[in-house]
């Protein structure tokens, strides 16, 4: 068993049936095995190999030596000088101190396990784990190819892997105290890496797709690497030197690792994900991609945070996060949000959402420059967030949005608190967070400045709640440094009517809703003469008085009025077309007459309300239709004298629109009944003859009318949350008046059925209710219309035996600047 081989001996044949060989020679004196031209058993050494000597394998290229000894325990080197080596059992290389592989050599582990000391493989060699398990206990250098599946265990020492091993799918385990260095991102192939020791990637570039686990360290030097594997099981440390860029695009890429960053850590993702890792060092974090990354751990890194695209969120209201970054830059496509603290300064050119709960706080330890948009909390969801700037605030034409429960001085609100100075220009908008509007005294403080308050904060857009408009103003006296929201009228803007400076600013929409509601209740109202002109006509061929016919009238009007505060002036223009037809007529005694008819109508009303307090305007419109019945009775159907009664009832339906300046458009519907009863008495007061044979008869007709208006508008909630309730329907309007008209007939028209009736009419109208709108708890009403005086001038004429025309103009005057001018043109065709 003590056979040896050396330079002066012929050697041992591999196929000798020896049971044990003790290796004593080393280097050039090592036992050398070759299997040139041999296969099967002839190329297999099954003897036990023991001793401290080396084992050399020297077959020609492509020829294979197989080792199958079960109890090999030699401790020398294994030198694969040429050819191939095939393992047929576990640990056939004994306790070899090292495995050396020359160029073009191949080791096939063939599914078996082997522990070696050091591995040294030359470029061009191939170590195929092939489902086996290779343990390296003393590091080494692998310049050849590592291929196959199985396990590669680095127990100790420094193991340097050169180049790419894309065909290696084995799991690599780096034990605590061991180190593996790579110069290619695929140095350990595609298999899992259990890094309880140190994995060092030096000057590598590309995607690291291996799944990492363990508690050790993975370091990157002079590298540009994108993590692509599932590293959820890695809880060690990722280290970046100052010349390294490391990209992560999902939470599993970083696992539970702490990150020591001296370079650039790039968070790039199209999706949202949460980063629980702590980051230290003096390197930078760069956010790219449209997704949002939420940081849930405090980080002590002091480098720059550059949000180039997408969002970076710091914690939540109940779990704020501190970021020690000395400079945070938010680009135009970037967003910073959350609750917590940035110890450094922030330059915002994108979107900065400070606070994300009911009362979140965000603190900026340095200065804040706002060139983009800042939102305190999520817009419209809650009020009570605070943005605290320990340094100075500079507005570079940026914008801030506050959520405020718009009410009185005690209202909950978001707030900007600046411990230093303010400079520059900033636009401010406010979103109502459920407030119903109220009267303020000093106002609701939005911006508090401890230092010099040289910055200008200008209101952007309207701020409305309930019936009130709010304005952003600088405080007075000792509060001059701060900025407030107030519903109080500070300075009227050239008011058309004097307004008390202690009043509060009403929204013009209140006037518009009221104008719409008044329009739907009055649009189709009429009196007898509006509908039918001359009450009856004479058939010249028979001399009979007749009243059956089809009629149409068109009316237009312009109305102007103020609300009770005199801040709101409303003007409206209306067009109405109605048509109808008598469908039946008769007489009860041969002297009187009655008729029954149907009618329908279309109307349109446009109105505008302007606030003299704020200059804001609101526009409204109504489109509606009606259908109804009418009935008329005349006591005397022959000589135009005596008593008459007239009544009508209509059902109307309407589409309403309101558009406030800078506010969302609002739409709602109205529908309901209107009805009227009218009576009058016509008597002749005189007669005189004019020149050229004209006969003139003078008549007076006292009139009384009661009109009931019950068109209801739907209760409505505006987009800003204001509840709208319109009142005044149920109004009963009474009209008392008299018409004086002249019936003229010229002998030239005898036999032509032509006559004219110029008239003048005066009325007093009384309304039991005023039309108004309740906006949350504040009412805006139409003033001046409770008692109205009316004058009408017009003419009614029978043009031909079959055609009547009439027209008139009139004006109604009331208190508080109320006026309504109207014109009517009608025709009736008899058949």
Features from the language model and the residues they span:
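Transmembrane beta-barrel domains of outer membrane proteins
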Residues: 46, 56-58, 64, 228, ...
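Outer membrane beta-barrel translocator domains of Type V secretion systems
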Residues: 493-691, 808-810, 815-822, 828
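Outer membrane beta-barrel transmembrane domains
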Residues: 628, 710, 719-831
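Surface-exposed loop/turn positions within long extracellular repeat scaffolds
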Residues: 20, 24-27, 42-52, 63-124, ...
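Long, polar low-complexity repeats
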Residues: 370-372, 376-410, 416
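Residue-level detector of the transmembrane beta-barrel scaffold of outer-membrane proteins
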Residues: 349, 401, 549-553, 595-599, ...
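Outer-membrane beta-barrel strand-turn architecture
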Residues: 542-546, 585-590, 635-639, 683-687, ...
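Outer-membrane translocation/initiation segment of Type V secreted surface proteins
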Residues: 1-42, 46, 401-404, 412-413, ...
């Amino acid at each position: 068993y003590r056979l040896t081989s050396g330079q002066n001996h012929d050697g041992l044949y591999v196929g000798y049936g020896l049971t044990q060989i003790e290796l004593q020679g080393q280097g050039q004196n090592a036992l050398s095995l070759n299997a040139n031209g041999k296969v099967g058993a002839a190329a297999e050494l099954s003897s036990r190999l023991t001793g401290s000597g080396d084992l050399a394998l020297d077959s020609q290229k492509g020829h294979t030596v197989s080792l199958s000894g079960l109890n090999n325990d030699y401790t020398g080197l294994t030198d694969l000088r040429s050819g191939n080596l095939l393992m047929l059992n576990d640990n056939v290389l004994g306790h070899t101190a090292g495995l050396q592989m020359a160029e073009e050599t191949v080791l096939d582990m063939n599914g078996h396990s082997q522990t070696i000391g050091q591995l040294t493989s030359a470029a061009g060699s191939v170590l195929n784990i092939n489902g086996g398990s290779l343990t390296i206990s003393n590091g080494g250098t692998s310049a050849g190819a590592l291929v196959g599946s199985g396990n590669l265990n680095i127990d100790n020492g420094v193991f340097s892997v050169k180049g790419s091993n894309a065909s290696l799918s084995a799991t690599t385990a780096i034990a605590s105290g061991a180190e593996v260095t790579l110069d290619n991102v695929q140095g350990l192939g595609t298999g899992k890496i259990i890094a309880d020791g140190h994995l060092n990637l030096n000057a590598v570039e590309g995607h690291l797709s291996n799944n990492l686990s363990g508690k050790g360290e993975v370091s990157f030097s002079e590298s540009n690497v994108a993590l692509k594997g599932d590293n959820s099981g890695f809880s060690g440390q990722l280290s970046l030197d100052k010349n390294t860029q490391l990209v992560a695009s999902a939470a599993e890429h970083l696992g539970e690792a702490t990150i020591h960053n001296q370079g650039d850590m790039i968070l790039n993702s199209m999706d949202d994900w949460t980063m629980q890792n702590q980051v230290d060092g003096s390197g930078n974090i760069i956010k790219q991609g449209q997704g949002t990354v939420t940081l849930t751990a405090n980080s002590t890194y002091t480098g720059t945070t550059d949000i180039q695209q997408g969002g970076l969120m710091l914690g939540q209201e109940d779990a704020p996060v501190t970021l020690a970054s000395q400079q945070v830059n938010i680009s135009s496509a970037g967003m910073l949000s959350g609750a917590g603290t940035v110890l450094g300064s922030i330059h915002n050119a994108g979107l900065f959402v400070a606070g994300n709960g009911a009362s979140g706080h965000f603190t900026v330890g340095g200065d804040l420059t706002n060139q983009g948009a800042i939102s305190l909390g999520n817009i419209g969801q809650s009020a009570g967030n605070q943005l605290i700037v320990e340094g100075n605030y500079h507005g570079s034409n940026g914008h801030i949005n506050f959520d405020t429960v718009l009410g009185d001085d005690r209202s909950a609100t978001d707030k900007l608190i600046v411990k230093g100075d303010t400079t520059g220009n900033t636009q401010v908008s406010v979103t109502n967070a459920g407030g119903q509007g109220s009267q303020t005294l000093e106002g609701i403080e939005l911006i508090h400045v401890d230092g010099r308050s040289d910055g200008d904060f200008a209101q952007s857009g309207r701020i409305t709640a309930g019936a009130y408009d709010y304005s952003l103003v600088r405080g007075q006296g000792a509060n001059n440094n701060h900025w407030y929201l107030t519903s109080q009228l500070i300075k009227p803007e050239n008011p058309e009517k004097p307004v008390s400076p202690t009043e509060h600013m009403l929204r013009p929409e209140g006037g518009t809703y009221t104008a719409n509601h008044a329009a739907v209740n009055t649009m189709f109202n009429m009196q007898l003469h509006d509908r039918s002109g001359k009450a009856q006509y004479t058939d010249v061929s028979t001399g009979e008085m007749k009243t059956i016919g089809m009629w149409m009238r068109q009316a237009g009007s312009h109305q102007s009025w103020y609300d009770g505060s005199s801040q709101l002036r409303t003007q409206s223009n209306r067009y109405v077309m109605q048509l109808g037809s008598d469908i039946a007529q008769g007489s009860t005694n041969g002297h009187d007459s009655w008729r029954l008819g149907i009618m329908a109508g279309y109307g349109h009303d446009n109105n505008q309300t302007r606030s003299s307090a704020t200059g804001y305007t609101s526009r409204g419109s109504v489109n509606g239709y009606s259908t109804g019945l009418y009935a008329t009775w005349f006591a005397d159907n022959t000589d135009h004298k005596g008593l008459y009664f007239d009544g009508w009832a209509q059902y109307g339906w309407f589409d309403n629109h309101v558009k406030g300046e800078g506010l969302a458009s609002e739409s709602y519907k109205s529908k309901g009944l209107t009805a009227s009863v009218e009576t009058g008495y016509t008597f002749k007061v005189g007669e005189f003859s004019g020149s050229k044979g004209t006969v003139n008869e003078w008549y007076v007709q006292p009139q009384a009318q009661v009109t009931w208006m019950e068109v209801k508008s739907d209760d409505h909630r505006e987009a800003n949350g204001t509840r709208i309730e319109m009142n005044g329907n149920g109004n009963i309007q009474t009209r008392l008046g008299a018409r004086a008209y002249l019936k003229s007939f010229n002998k030239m028209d005898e036999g032509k059925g032509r006559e004219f009736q110029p008239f003048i009419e005066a009325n007093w109208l009384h309304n039991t209710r005023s039309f108004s709108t309740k906006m949350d708890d504040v009412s805006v009403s139409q003033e001046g219309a409770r008692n109205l005086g009316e004058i009408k001038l017009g003419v009614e004429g029978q043009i031909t035996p079959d055609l009547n025309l009439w027209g008139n103009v009139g004006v109604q005057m009331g208190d508080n600047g109320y006026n309504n001018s109207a014109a009517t043109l009608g025709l009736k065709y008899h058949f």
